[in-house]
């Protein structure tokens, strides 16, 4: 009888794969503190060839931006430095799967034009086959589709472009920004710092624009017509001043009800008239 031999970690993983739901197995690997070894095991064992062929297809695809890595190595690096949220981890894993299908040669270089859109369709098709639910699949596909939107920000975005980015991100905006942060595996520390700084700037602009829009959307409890009728005054600058007083009052004390608001307006008007 051959002596018993303890399985290596990779072999143990592979044996477990045969009896585990594909989505459960992949998720188990992704949420590890460092998923790199597990992801390489999925590729090297042949598991990915059977259940996730989009992943090993990246192995020979050279990334013109990250020249020291093929796209598979880059993908695993991005996934390993993503936040430990399954939605973001899956988006990182799928974010470049469209590259082999969009490769073209222009001006002496390689491009992958619209690979995000192609990758989103591929993620939407593959994830249900792995056993993932529709909602998670939709979110991951959306993140993959939007993953390249940040490119060009440092060239100068208008406020409209910033609003569009935030609007397109919607409820996934935080996940999208985390994915963008993770998608920088450069060996040049200055490049990493520059990308994170630019994304910090974008996030601050988004917050500032949201605050501005919220302020513009604010309204006092009563409108200009009610002010004119109550104070028995003509339309003019004083109406705007009264409305600003009432808006400031609402910001400080909240909604008071029309009776109390009119009483405060009377006090303001009396003090102003003296």
Regions found by a protein language model. Name each.
Residues 18-19, 30-33, 67-70, 114-121, ...:
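Short acidic alpha-helix initiation/capping motifs at coil-to-helix transition points
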Residues 47-49, 148, 233:
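Core structural elements
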Residues 11, 15-113:
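Acidic/His-rich, divalent-metal-binding segments that scaffold phosphate/diphosphate chemistry
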Residues 27, 79, 124-128, 162-166, ...:
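Amphipathic alpha-helical segments within well-ordered protein domains
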Residues 39, 52, 137-145, 239-244:
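Short, well-structured alpha-helical segments
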Residues 38, 42, 78, 144, ...:
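A residue-level signal for conserved active-site and pocket-lining positions in enzyme catalytic cores
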Residues 76-194:
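Divalent metal-dependent catalytic cores for phosphoryl transfer on phosphate-bearing substrates
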Residues 1-6, 13-17, 186-274:
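Charged substrate- and nucleic-acid-binding regions of tRNA-handling and nucleotidyl-transfer enzymes
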């Amino acid at each position: 009888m051959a002596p018993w031999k303890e399985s290596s970690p990779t072999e143990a993983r592979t044996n477990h794969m045969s009896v585990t739901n594909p989505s459960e197995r992949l998720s188990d690997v992704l949420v590890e503190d460092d998923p790199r070894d597990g992801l390489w095991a999925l590729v090297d064992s042949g598991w990915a060839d059977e259940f996730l062929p989009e992943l090993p297809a990246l192995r020979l695809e050279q990334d013109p931006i990250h020249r020291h890595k093929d796209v598979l190595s880059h993908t695993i690096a991005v996934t390993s430095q993503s936040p430990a949220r399954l939605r973001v981890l899956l988006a990182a894993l799928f974010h470049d799967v469209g590259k082999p299908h969009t490769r073209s040669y222009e001006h002496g270089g390689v491009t992958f034009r619209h690979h995000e859109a192609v990758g989103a369709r591929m993620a939407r098709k593959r994830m249900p086959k792995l056993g993932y639910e529709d909602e998670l699949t939709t979110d991951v596909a959306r993140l993959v589709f939007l993953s390249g939107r940040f490119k060009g920000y440092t060239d100068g975005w208008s406020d409209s472009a910033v609003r569009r980015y935030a609007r397109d991100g919607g409820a996934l905006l935080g996940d999208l920004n985390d994915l963008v942060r993770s998608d920088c595996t450069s060996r040049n520390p200055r490049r990493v710092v520059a990308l994170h700084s630019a994304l910090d700037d974008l996030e601050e602009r988004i917050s500032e624009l949201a605050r501005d829009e919220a302020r513009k959307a604010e309204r006092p409890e009563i409108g200009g017509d009610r002010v004119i009728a109550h104070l028995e005054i003509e339309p003019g600058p004083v109406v705007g001043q009264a409305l600003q007083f009432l808006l400031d009052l609402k910001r400080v004390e909240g909604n008071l009800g029309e009776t109390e608001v009119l009483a405060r307006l009377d006090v303001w008007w009396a003090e102003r008239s003296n």
